């Protein structure tokens, strides 16, 4: 419950109100793919191609990849 994902944890159990994470075990609840992240929505990975970070300046938007909760940087990141 320290807001860090540590070895053996699938999710951080620091937020008992998180519906995706079992606060007692720090494991994802049955059926959950993720508990947090820019590409996690209602315990599921957002579909590939969903914008997760809007471009700033000369950069380009970043998109979810459909297989993780993180928001990968585009290959042209400035």
Curated annotation (Swiss-Prot):
Tissue pattern of expression reads:
Expressed by the venom gland.
- UniProt key word Disulfide bond: yes
InterPro entries linked to this entry: Disintegrin_CS, Disintegrin_dom, Disintegrin_dom_sf
Where is the protein localized? Secreted
**Gene Ontology CC terms, in alphabetical order:** extracellular region
- In chain numbering, where does the site feature May bind to both beta-3 (ITGB3) and alpha-V (ITGAV) integrin subunits fall? 77
Q: Motif Cell attachment site in this chain: where?
A: 56-58
Major localization class: secreted
Disulfide pattern: 11-26, 13-21, 20-43, 34-40, 39-64, 52-71
**Entries under Pfam families matching the protein:** Disintegrin
Question: What SUPFAM superfamilies does this protein map onto?
Answer: Blood coagulation inhibitor (disintegrin)
Indicate the annotated site residue(s) for May bind to alpha-V integrin (ITGAV) subunit. Answer: 53, 56, 73
The chain's coiled-coil residues are: none
Gene Ontology molecular function terms on file = toxin activity
Q: SMART domains of this UniProt entry?
A: DISIN
Task: Please report the stretch or stretches of sequence annotated as the Disintegrin domain.
Answer: 1-78
Residues under site feature: May bind to metal ioncoordinated at the beta-3 integrin (ITGB3) subunit? 58
Please give the superkingdom of this protein's source. Answer: Eukaryota
Indicate the annotated site residue(s) for May bind to beta-3 integrin (ITGB3) subunit: 76
Q: Which PANTHER family is this protein grouped with? A: ADAM A DISINTEGRIN AND METALLOPROTEASE DOMAIN, ADAM METALLOPROTEASE
Q: What else is known?
A: Is derived from the P-II subfamily of the venom metalloproteinase (M12B) family.
Q: How does it assemble?
A: Monomer.
Write out the function statement from the record: This recombinant disintegrin antagonizes integrins alpha-IIb/beta-3 (ITGA2B/ITGB3) and alpha-V/beta-3 (ITGAV/ITGB3). On ITGA2B/ITGB3, it interferes with the outside/-in phosphorylation of the focal adhesion kinase (PTK2 / FAK) downstream of the integrin. It strongly inhibits platelet aggregation induced by ADP, thrombin, and collagen, abolishes and reverses dynamic platelet recruitment to immobilized fibrinogen. In vivo, it induces a dramatic increase in the tail bleeding time, and has a strong antithrombotic activity.
For this entry, the protein name equals: Disintegrin DisBa-01
The organism's taxonomic lineage, starting at the top: Eukaryota, Metazoa, Chordata, Craniata, Vertebrata
């Amino acid at each position: 419950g320290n807001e860090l994902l540590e070895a053996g944890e699938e999710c951080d159990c620091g937020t008992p109100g998180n519906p995706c994470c079992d606060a007692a075990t720090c494991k994802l609840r049955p059926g959950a793919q993720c508990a947090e992240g820019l590409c996690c929505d209602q315990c599921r990975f957002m579909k590939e191609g969903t914008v997760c970070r809007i471009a700033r300046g000369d950069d380009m938007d970043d998109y979810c990849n459909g297989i993780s909760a993180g928001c990968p940087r585009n290959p042209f990141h400035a």
